[in-house]
Amino acid sequence: MIFTESTALENQKSDTPKLSLQYEQIATDTHTLRSLDWDRSRFDIEFGLRNGTTYNSFLIKGKKTALIDTSHLKFKNIWFEKLRQEINPTEIDYLIVSHTEPDHSGLIKYLIDLNPNIEIVASKVAIKFLEDQIHQPFKSRAVKSGEDLN
């Protein structure tokens, strides 16, 4: 299912960025929340993008509920609207942070505001970076490659 924030036509220039979301089940108890940024023209510096790009989050429900990554700040309104339709943010036990680039971590501060008890699971370096960026206390667990969460 696709949710959009912009009414701009695909070939029409607009001051409003063309943003949309897709929410899909990809496995039992696992869904993806895919943020589609149609206006992004570059990835890093060297890669041109003809059709924009996506920022992907994954919601996994089991004995505990984990969210892998958030999204870019520009998706804040529609991303949280859709997340709330699918789950109460206070029911998410873990936020697993794959890396701290803004397209994956841009909404972490706001998720912590909604769920102060969420545990951030990331590398030691990522946790330190988030502490320096967020400027508020949060629960965290530093993990290394190969470790299990549960």
Which positions does each model-derived feature cover?
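Active-site metal-binding motif and surrounding structural segment of the metallo-beta-lactamase
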Residues: K63, K74-V121
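Conserved beta-strand hairpin/beta-sheet module of binuclear metal-dependent hydrolase folds
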Residues: Y23-Q85
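Short glycine-/acidic-enriched loop or helix-start segments at secondary-structure transitions
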Residues: R42-F43, L107-I108, D132
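Metallo-beta-lactamase
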Residues: L9, S14, K18, E24-T28, ...
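Cytosolic, low-complexity regulatory segments enriched in Ser/Pro/Gly with interspersed Lys/Arg
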Residues: I2-A8
